[in-house]
Amino acid sequence: MTSKTLILICNQFPFGRGETFISNEFNYLHSAFDKVVILSRTDETVQTRQIPNDVELFKISPKSNLLQKIKFLFILVSNRQRVKRLLKHEESSVYSIFKKPATDSQKRKMKHDLFKALEIKNYIEKKIIPKTGTNVIVYSYWQNSSALSGILLKEDKLCNQAISRAHRGDLYFDVQ
């Protein structure tokens, strides 16, 4: 029997002061999986919350340095059809919701989020999947580029399932 692994992608947990609700559900997650991996998108260095010793913790900076931007160009070139398809889908989603084309600002945000999603997906594919195998559920605490990275991993059959928590701002456009 293969072991079940959870990859939890969050912005700070177990660092910093945010994402306090993860603390409340973490014991349930930990007991439901054979292995738990946390990928925290933070530059924080001080761990403020305790996690069990058997949980693997990875960090990826939310900021992109020059080397990451250069790497992204290679990722972008090798995924250009996928990028084109995803951006077209995003633009059509904006049109279906707002009944007008995406603004330049929205298009820049879409490209940035896709860049970050590909960066996170690439990190998980290269650094975490070799240690865990693909019997994995990716759980993004936020519906942002982290959630999109889970979808990309699922499309590439590198995980069994990709899920994301929905917060009020994800559901209601008047709350941002």
Regions found by a protein language model. Give the residues of each.
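N-terminal subdomain of nucleotide-sugar transferases
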Residues: M1-I70, K131-T134, N160
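A short, histidine- and acid-enriched strand-loop-helix "catalytic/donor-clamping" loop
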Residues: Q12-G16, N144-A147, D156, N160-Q176
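A short acidic, amphipathic alpha-helical/loop segment
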Residues: F21-E25, S149-L153, Q176
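Membrane-proximal helix-turn-helix segments that form the acceptor-binding/catalytic region
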Residues: E25-Y28, E125, G133, Q161, ...
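Active-site catalytic microenvironments for nucleophilic, acid-base chemistry
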Residues: A32, L153-D156
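A conserved catalytic-core segment of Leloir-type glycosyltransferases
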Residues: T45-F115
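Short, well-ordered alpha-helical microsegments
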Residues: T45-V46, S146-G150
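Short N-terminal targeting/anchoring amphipathic segment
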Residues: S96-F98, R108-A117, K121-S145, I163
